[in-house]
């Protein structure tokens, strides 16, 4: 079923993530060759595409404009109890703050539909026959660490054979929320 997700793209890991999608879920590959599949999710699933009104788009624009861009590093490979192998961003606070702000603003869309805690991460692959953590370490040895900057957020529609970016929101282009509050007091 089609759904939307808000995420921070991580171009430095795109070759690996694209390859993993080709192996584990090719139907989710975007037909757009410039699409960045490697990402850290902020909120998903998000609003159905039919609910993306001009007011909602404007609200997201303002929310992200008030959030500062930030640097992060992806180096530490971890595994969730479900067997999902992922990279943990350091520092994680920027992702956690954005997710908390989105969750507070849009309580009808809890992170991961309320099934999992909103732990910032970049999904790599699932453990399974012939795929263990040591193999993932070996595959990523030449790519890690990845130093990146969260500068914008993509609103992406996921649909089999039709995944695409609907909108891109820059971070930090407006007054930061705490600065805006200070200037009005």
Residue ranges and their predicted role:
Residues 1-71, 92-151, 164-185:
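Basic, often amphipathic N-terminal segments
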Residues 75-82, 120, 153-164:
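Short proline/glycine- and acidic-rich turn/helix-capping motifs at secondary-structure junctions
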Residues 83-84, 98:
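Short, conserved acidic/polar surface loops in the N-terminal third of protein domains
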Residues 86-87, 124, 155:
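Short hydrophobic/aromatic-rich beta-strand segments that constitute the beta-sheet cores
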Residues 89, 158, 171:
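Active-site donor-binding loop signature of nucleotide-sugar glycosyltransferases
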């Amino acid at each position: 079923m089609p759904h939307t997700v808000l995420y921070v793209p991580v171009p430095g890991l795109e070759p690996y993530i694209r390859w993993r999608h080709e192996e584990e879920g090719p139907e989710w590959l975007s037909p757009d060759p410039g699409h960045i599949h490697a990402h850290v999710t902020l909120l998903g699933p998000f609003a159905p595409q039919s609910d993306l009104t001009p007011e909602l788009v404007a609200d997201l624009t303002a929310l992200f404009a008030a959030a500062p861009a930030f640097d992060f590093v992806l180096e530490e490979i971890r595994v969730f109890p479900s067997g999902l192998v992922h990279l943990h961003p350091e520092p994680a606070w920027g992702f956690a703050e954005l997710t908390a702000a989105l969750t507070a603003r849009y309580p009808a869309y809890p992170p991961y539909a309320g099934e999992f805690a909103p732990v910032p991460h970049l999904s790599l692959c699932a453990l399974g026959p012939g795929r263990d953590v040591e193999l993932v370490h070996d595959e990523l040895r030449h790519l890690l660490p990845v130093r990146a900057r969260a500068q914008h957020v993509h609103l992406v529609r996921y649909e089999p054979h039709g995944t695409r970016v609907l909108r891109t929101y820059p971070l930090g282009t407006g007054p930061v929320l705490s600065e805006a509050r200070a200037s009005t007091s």
